[in-house]
Design a protein with these regions (language model features):
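Ferredoxin-type iron-sulfur electron-transfer modules in oxidoreductases and energy-metabolism complexes
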Residues: 21
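Thiamine diphosphate
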Residues: 1, 9, 16, 24-28, ...
Length: 198
């Protein structure tokens, strides 16, 4: 559809995720059951899962918090080059991001930090809440959004990709203090196969 997560972002009590791996889905479902049924929070979930077959790795250590907040560091490529980029991907496109990191490393000597973004929407919510707090507390210590904390000590421009239109990942632009480029499936209807789409 290319835009359903953007529609979900307009509903305040909708918690939406676009996970890639089975362990991400498990963490999200467990937390969702706890919040909705045990804590009785007035929320509901919108979770997208794709119909592609691919290997699912083991869950990285200490990934749970990042999975629920919206992003976590999945992998770093290490070369002897001086150039580094931040690659953000969600859903099935994360696998394309991982492949892109390999190409950048092997063919161009560019290192990458690969981030799995389970929810651009939750990251945006956190960014907006942080912005609001800073606006209402001008004399207090300025807070930083979760995405700012993740990326502030990382080098290089940020490239964000998803299986949705560019404006989905572009929601992070105000909270990233680095050159930011978003990629998506704009023009989806013109692609006859998944290979051509990607």
């Amino acid at each position: 559809d290319g835009h359903s997560h953007l529609m979900a972002s307009n509903i305040p009590n909708c918690v939406s995720y676009d996970p890639t791996f089975a362990y991400e889905m498990a963490v999200i479902l467990r937390d969702g059951m706890k919040r909705m049924h045990e804590k009785k929070e007035n929320i509901f979930y919108y979770i997208t899962a794709m119909n592609e077959n691919y290997p699912h790795p083991a869950k990285p250590k200490d990934a749970d918090e990042g999975i629920l907040k919206g992003m976590y560091l999945l992998k770093e490529t290490k070369n002897k080059g001086n150039t580094r980029v931040q690659l953000l991907g969600s859903g099935t496109i994360l696998r394309e991001v991982i492949d892109a990191a390999e190409i950048l490393s092997k063919e161009y000597g560019i290192d990458s930090d690969i981030w799995s973004v389970t929810s651009f929407n939750e990251l945006r919510k956190d960014g907006m809440e942080t912005e609001r707090w800073n606006l209402l507390n001008p004399d207090g210590k300025k807070k930083k959004s979760y995405v700012e904390k993740c990326l502030e000590k990382r080098e290089g421009p940020v490239f964000a990709a998803s299986d949705y239109i560019r404006s989905f990942s572009d929601q992070l632009r105000p909270y990233v203090n680095k050159p930011f480029y978003s990629f998506g499936t704009d023009g989806y209807g013109r692609s006859d196969t998944r290979k051509n789409l990607r």
